[in-house]
């Protein structure tokens, strides 16, 4: 009996698209590797910057070497590339640094996987080998971690080293010592809480980056109203988000017909009376400072001035939220029950000058650890990149305060993990050993890229570094100032254990997810249905 051959049947809707097996895998690999190649030139202390230009009505220019910022601002269509972009964003949210490293490591793992699949090694065999390699690498990283949490002097030095290492690959590298000190002082003021909301960063054009400073207290980028006190001691602050243009019902497009101008004056008088009534309800709280998220308008401002109350209007939402946190108050919107409203407090409110701008300074706030870092710089792009760099350093330091374990940087940790994985591969029979070797090779690519970006002979340096670790020199790493192999413990090139651990685990998981893909199915685009019932 002749066998029937079934013709392939398309089960998808018209317009849907499917990529299978090798085609799907190749699409994923190409997209992920392209993302890694895009950001790898920014890796390390001598990494390059990217200029990001956006078009359209809100056209802007951004100069950065922050991996998460670059990936966040580029549009990607490849699904595997989107996985790496999301992973980089999570790395930024979780620990604040290592966004470029995690993307490059995942891309290098997939580059190795591509060559293994070309040798007919099954993806599941590769994944099994990678999982064992990840376990060995994590154990090697854990065993190399140093904890100085119980020694205050050594721990502070660790924080200085970590901040210096983080900032060395950023725009702030030329003012590294200055900003390292600022970041460490700001984080130590938090007293272990790790609440970065208490650290406010203000950017002001003018001067140079070296003119940036840490201010103990809170700065609000607003001006005090006309004819109001410019300085208040022992302030009681009511923070509000309320409309001061009376509580009238606004009827848009309505008209009022009157037979004389006296009637118009009566309407204005009635509105003023409602405003006055609201101001009186606010004053019953026994305050001497009123800060509103919305506009206050001239007449209520006059009333506050006559009562000797400082009134600040149109404070931005983030500023109001942070001010409520640091002064210990709550944001109110109704004022009928003064006993239920929690007021903020501080020892002194005064107007200060920074450059050519006036700001309001709150000192002696209820949240003692609150502080403001004022950034100065020649252009807005420099200030924006300085803020991103400083934010990364603050995030890493906050993580280190929670988990005080540290590891060595300069490619030392990657080489240490690669050495442990290679030793495991030598003891493992079968094809899984080949997958482990590829994992170790991907780890060794990170110091290779760091050396390449600095313009040194990466093959020679990485070979020397590998030999040093094979001989048991577990603190050897790349000294990019001299272009040689150095002792990371002596040079003080230290990184947070949590950052390195997160880079390792996230990259391995993302690479595994992409490697498992054997089909990419794109849904049919939605068709616009014509409107048969026009208005």
UniProtKB/Swiss-Prot annotation:
This is T-complex protein 1 subunit beta. Belongs to the TCP-1 chaperonin family. There is a cross-link at residue 248 (Glycyl lysine isopeptide (Lys-Gly) (interchain with G-Cter in SUMO2)). The gene is CCT2. Component of the chaperonin-containing T-complex (TRiC), a hexadecamer composed of two identical back-to-back stacked rings enclosing a protein folding chamber. Each ring is made up of eight different subunits: TCP1/CCT1, CCT2, CCT3, CCT4, CCT5, CCT6A/CCT6, CCT7, CCT8. Interacts with PACRG. Interacts with FLCN. Interacts with DLEC1. Interacts with SVEP1. ADP binds at residues 44, 98-101, 168-169, 410, 495, 500. One of its GO terms (biological process) is chaperone-mediated protein complex assembly. Pfam families: Cpn60_TCP1. The modification N6-acetyllysine is found at residues 13, 154, 181.
């Amino acid at each position: 009996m002749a066998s029937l051959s079934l013709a392939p049947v398309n089960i998808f809707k018209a317009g849907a698209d499917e990529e299978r097996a090798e085609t799907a895998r190749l699409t994923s690999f190409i997209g992920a590797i392209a993302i890694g190649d895009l950001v790898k030139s920014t890796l390390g202390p001598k990494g390059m910057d990217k200029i990001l230009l956006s078009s359209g009505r809100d056209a802007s220019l951004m100069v950065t070497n922050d991996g998460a910022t670059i990936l966040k601002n580029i549009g990607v269509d490849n699904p595997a590339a989107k996985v790496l972009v999301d992973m980089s964003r999570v790395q930024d949210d979780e620990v604040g640094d290592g966004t470029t490293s995690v993307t490059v490591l995942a891309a290098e793992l997939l580059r190795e996987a591509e060559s293994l699949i070309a040798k007919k090694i099954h993806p599941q065999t590769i994944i099994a080998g990678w999982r064992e390699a990840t376990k060995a690498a994590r154990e090697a990283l854990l065993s190399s971690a140093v904890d100085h949490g119980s020694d205050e002097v050594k721990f502070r030095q660790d924080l200085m080293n970590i901040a210096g290492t983080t900032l060395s690959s950023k725009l702030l590298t030329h003012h590294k010592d200055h900003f390292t000190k600022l970041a460490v002082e700001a984080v130590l003021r938090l007293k272990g809480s790790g609440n970065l909301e208490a650290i406010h960063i203000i950017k002001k054009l003018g001067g140079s980056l070296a003119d940036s400073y840490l201010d103990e207290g809170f700065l609000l980028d607003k001006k005090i109203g006309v004819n109001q006190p410019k300085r208040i001691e022992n302030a009681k602050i009511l923070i509000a988000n309320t409309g001061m243009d009376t509580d009238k019902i606004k009827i848009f497009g309505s008209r009022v017909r009157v037979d004389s101008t006296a009637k118009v004056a009566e309407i204005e008088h009635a509105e003023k009376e409602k405003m006055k009534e609201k101001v009186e309800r606010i004053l019953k709280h026994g305050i001497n400072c009123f800060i509103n998220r919305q506009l206050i308008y001239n007449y209520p401002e006059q009333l506050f001035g006559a009562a000797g109350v400082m009134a600040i209007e149109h404070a931005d939402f983030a500023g109001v939220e942070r001010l409520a946190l640091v002064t210990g108050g709550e944001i109110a919107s109704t004022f009928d029950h003064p006993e239920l409203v929690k007021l903020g407090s501080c020892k002194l409110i005064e107007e200060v000058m920074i450059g050519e701008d006036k700001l309001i300074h709150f000192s002696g706030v209820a949240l003692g650890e609150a502080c403001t870092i004022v950034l100065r710089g020649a252009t807005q792009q420099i200030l924006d990149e300085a803020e991103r760099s400083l934010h990364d350093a603050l995030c890493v330091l906050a993580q280190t305060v929670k988990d005080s374990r540290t590891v060595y940087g300069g490619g030392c940790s990657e080489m240490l993990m690669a050495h442990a994985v290679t030793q495991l591969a030598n003891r493992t029979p079968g094809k899984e050993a080949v997958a482990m070797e590829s994992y170790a090779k991907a780890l060794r690519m990170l110091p290779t890229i760091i050396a390449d970006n600095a313009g040194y002979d990466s093959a020679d340096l990485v070979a020397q570094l590998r030999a040093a670790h094979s001989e048991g020199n577990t603190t050897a790493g790349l000294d990019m100032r001299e272009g040689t192999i150095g002792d990371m413990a002596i040079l003080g090139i230290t990184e947070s254990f949590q950052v390195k651990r997160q880079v390792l685990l996230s990259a391995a998981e993302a690479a595994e997810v992409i490697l498992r893909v054997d089909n990419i199915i794109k849904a049919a685009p939605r068709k616009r249905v014509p409107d048969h019932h026009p208005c």
